[in-house]
Amino acid sequence: MTLAEKHVNTGKDGRITPRERILAVAADLYYRHGIRAVGVESIAEAAGTNKMTLYRHFPSKDELVAEYLRRLADKASSSWDRLAAEHPGNPRAQLRGWLQNMAAHVGSGNERGCALANAAIELPEKDHPARRVIEAFKTAQRQRIIDLCAAAELDQPEMLADELFLLLEGARVTAQSIGRDGLSDRLIRMGEAMIAAHER
C-alpha cells in the first residue's frame, strides 16, 4: 500500500472524489520526491485531472501542502488513541508501545523519515500555512509524551520526553544516512534505558 492509498477518503458511493485523488497523489509525490521538487502540474497530471480542478479544491499549492500534512498529523495522533485503548490506565505501557511503534516505523524498508520533519526542513518560512500544522503537531506530540511520563510517575517527565523525542529524530536521520540494520533494536534498548534512568 502506498502512502497515497493510506490517506484516501471516499465519497458516499465509495468512489474516490477528485479532491481526494489529488490529495492522495500529492501525498505520494511529496513524500517520495520532496515538496519543493513537485509542482502542481505534475500532481494534476498524475491525478488524471488539470490545474483548474486542482485549484478549485485547493486555492494554492501551500494550502494543498498544509492539507497533506494535516492528514498525516491526524493519522499519527490517532495512534495515541489506539495505544490508550490497548493499554487503558497504564501510561508506562502506552509509552513503551509508542517506543515500539516508532522503532518498527524507523526500521521499515520504506522509511524516508518523518514526513512532517522533512517538510519542516523544506518549509522554513514561519508564515507558511503548513509550518503551523507541523509546529502544532510536534508540540502536541511532545506534550503527549510528557503527560505519559508524568502519569507513569517517572522523574523529570519533561526532560525524559525531550530525550525520547531527540532519540527518535536522531534514529530517523540515521536510517536515511547510515542504514537501518539493527536500528530498531537499538532504538528500543536506548529508549528503555532512558525510561529506566528516570524511574523513582
Predicted feature residues:
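Helix-turn-helix
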Residues: 2-4, 21, 25-63, 67
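Amphipathic C-terminal alpha-helical segment
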Residues: 105, 147, 165-183, 194-200
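Amphipathic alpha-helical packing segments from all-alpha helical-bundle domains
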Residues: 76-77, 83, 93-97, 126-151, ...
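Amphipathic alpha-helical segments used for helix-helix packing
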Residues: 93-94, 106-132
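Short, basic, alpha-helical segments at the C-terminal edge of helix-turn-helix-like DNA-binding modules
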Residues: 70-76
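N-terminal intrinsically disordered/low-complexity leader segments
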Residues: 1-17, 199-200
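Hydrophobic alpha-helical connector segments
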Residues: 67, 81-112, 151, 157, ...
